[in-house]
A protein has these predicted regions:
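Transmembrane and membrane-interface helices of multi-pass
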Residues: 1-172
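Active-site-proximal alpha/beta segments of enzymes that process anionic O-linked groups
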Residues: 153-389, 482, 487-505
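Generic structural signal for small/hydrophobic residues in well-ordered secondary structure
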Residues: 233, 302, 379, 410, ...
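A short beta-strand-to-alpha-helix junction
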Residues: 289-296, 396-406, 447-455, 467-489, ...
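Active-site His/acidic residue clusters
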Residues: 320, 363-408, 412, 435-446
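Marks the mature luminal ectodomains of secretory-pathway proteins
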Residues: 404, 408-411, 462, 487-490, ...
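Phosphate/adenylate-binding glycine loop and adjacent helical scaffold
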Residues: 497-544
């Protein structure tokens, strides 16, 4: 009897500070910051109650519990897992020490830290009056049984659905299109992982057969023009809203604006490959690195029609094997137009970043010297990338002043193009956002999860050399991606659009019935898609 009493006494001795661990997790789950693994937490709870007869055993038990507790907390959070970190190891090792320290500091959510301290103080104040372990155990038991009574606290993420209007593009069998279109509806309940996986495979198969229509050749009498594509790193629609720049007057000068354009990824390398392979439907992330498909390579298709290729960067293209990947995975043959530019920023990996306006003006000198009747120029800018700082400064510069400086340079470039009288199709198509605001599942500046805030980017088109175009932009309100943009370029060529001052056809006709693409975004270790009015997330090989 004495032995049983001693055992019971040790059992009811309580969890001690582990109560704070569990209670904090319960609150974080209620707020949507965690996805609580109930049975794993029960196992940890019970393990902590096991008796330890010696000091050495008690220390060992606490060390084991500490390791398990940290691993469990990490797995329940939305933080990148080990697989994601390893997949991005090459890029991470390029970060400067100063940038890493700033990321760690900025990662801390001070409101949550203060809330945790408050819970700790309450625990110390209450532990002499109530059995806190009993409260924690009852709370955990409630979380286990409450789903059976329909009162479980929400563990849903903050991936807010924002359904856009539009119709599914035609071109495949009716039943496949209908199956994809069904996902545009709404549903009160949640879809199963098996249902979403099946729909995703249907989506990928459908997209694989879609190809943008380009003319076979250009007639000798057709009016020549230049195509300029600005691929901008770290600029989403949500970033512009957060920086109060969404209504900047520079954007009002554009003729076409895509309101729901999905870049389909949140990293630069895959974004570049998706753009360069944008003359086809949307491939999976893994397919970007498979066998090349020449019919998808928009720069090479334009080259075959007589558009001379040029490439301009405000960086070296070395980081993360960026330039080499574009050449080997997307067949980019454009010569890299190098010049010694004035330095505007120093990047997170200590690389010099060129002055934006200087890069723009280099284009004019290159095309004027080349004297090609038609050209297509791809620009890639990283001036807005997180972690950039002014030369000589140690602290990174905020997004908003860098974005304003970039837009100001763009405004000057637009004015230069207007003065030049050149016929130009200027296209802005950002890679992805900077995650200026973040959300409950991902802190600001982190882009491991390609959420809608990061992948919905402000794509715009402006025509130069035509003086009778409408003053107000035409908005494309359906869900679109790179295939729609490639199709638009094909229509501009096919209609000989620059042959008349008002355009060969109305702008509304150019964008009418452009191919739509369902909102599906992927990185190597995370996927986000919209299905029946809700956004779903899949981490690595897990469940939706």
């Amino acid at each position: 009897v004495k032995s049983v009493g001693n055992f019971t006494g040790r059992m009811v001795g309580g969890l001690g500070l582990w109560n704070v661990y569990f209670i904090c997790k319960f609150f974080l789950t209620q707020l949507g910051y965690l996805r609580l693994e109930l049975f794993a937490n029960i196992a940890l709870f019970c393990f902590l109650l096991l008796p330890a007869n010696s000091k050495g055993m008690r220390v060992l038990k606490q060390l084991i519990a500490l390791g398990c507790g940290i691993a469990l907390l990490w797995s329940e959070s939305w933080l990148p897992g080990p697989q994601s970190i390893m997949a991005n190891a090459t890029g991470i090792t390029g970060f400067s020490v100063n940038y890493v320290l700033q990321l760690i500091w900025d990662f801390i959510n001070w409101r949550m830290v203060f809330a945790g301290c408050a819970i700790l103080l309450i625990y110390y104040a209450a532990r002499d009056f109530i059995r806190v372990t009993a409260v924690t155990g009852c709370w955990l038991l409630f979380l286990v049984v409450s789903p059976f009574f329909g009162s479980a606290p929400s563990q849903q993420s903050n991936l807010v659905p924002q359904t856009a209007t539009g119709k599914t593009a035609v071109g495949n069998p009716t039943d496949t299109a209908a199956a994809l279109a069904a996902a545009k509806g709404t549903s009160q309940g949640e879809a199963s992982s098996e249902e979403i996986d099946k729909w995703y495979q249907t989506f990928i198969a459908y997209e694989k057969d879609r190809v943008a229509k380009f003319p076979d050749s250009i007639k000798p009498k057709d009016t020549p023009f230049d195509i300029v594509i600005l691929n901008i790193c770290s600029l989403s629609t949500d970033d512009l809203i957060a920086a109060n720049l969404i209504n900047n007057r520079t954007f009002s000068q554009f003729n076409i604006r895509f309101d729901h354009f999905n870049s389909a990824t949140s990293y630069s390398g895959p974004a570049a490959l998706r753009l360069l392979n944008g003359a086809c439907g949307q491939p999976s992330h893994d397919a970007l690195y498979d066998t090349r498909r020449p019919e998808c390579e928009i720069m090479n298709r334009l080259d075959s029609l007589g558009f001379k290729q040029h490439l301009f960067l405000d960086h070296s293209g070395v980081y993360d094997n960026y330039l080499n990947a574009m050449r080997t995975q997307a067949g980019l043959t454009a010569p890299f137009e190098r010049r010694r530019y004035p330095v505007k920023y120093v990047s997170f990996n200590n690389e010099e970043i060129a002055d934006t306006l200087s890069v723009f003006r280099h284009w004019r000198s290159v095309v004027n010297k080349a004297k090609d009747p038609r050209s297509v120029s791809l620009f890639n800018f990283i001036a807005l990338h997180d972690g950039n700082r002014q030369p000589g400064k140690s602290r990174w510069e905020e997004f908003e002043p860098r974005a304003r400086a970039f837009i100001d340079a763009l405004d000057v470039f637009i004015a230069d193009l207007q003065k030049s009288k050149r016929k130009v199709m200027l296209i802005i198509v950002p890679e992805h956002g900077a995650a200026v605001r973040g959300d409950r599942i991902q802190t600001p500046r982190l882009r491991d999860i390609p959420s809608r805030r990061i992948t919905q980017v402000p794509v715009m088109v402006k025509f130069f050399g035509l003086n009778k175009l409408p003053k107000t932009p035409v908005h494309v309100t359906s869900d679109t991606s790179y295939l729609a943009l490639s199709t638009l370029i094909g229509r501009v060529i096919e209609t000989n659009y620059f042959s008349k001052p008002e355009g060969a056809v109305p702008i509304a006709d150019l964008v009418n019935d452009l191919p739509t693409t369902h909102m599906v975004s992927e990185n190597a270790q995370a996927m986000v898609l919209e299905y029946k009015g809700k956004d779903y997330l899949k981490m690595s090989k897990g469940q939706w």
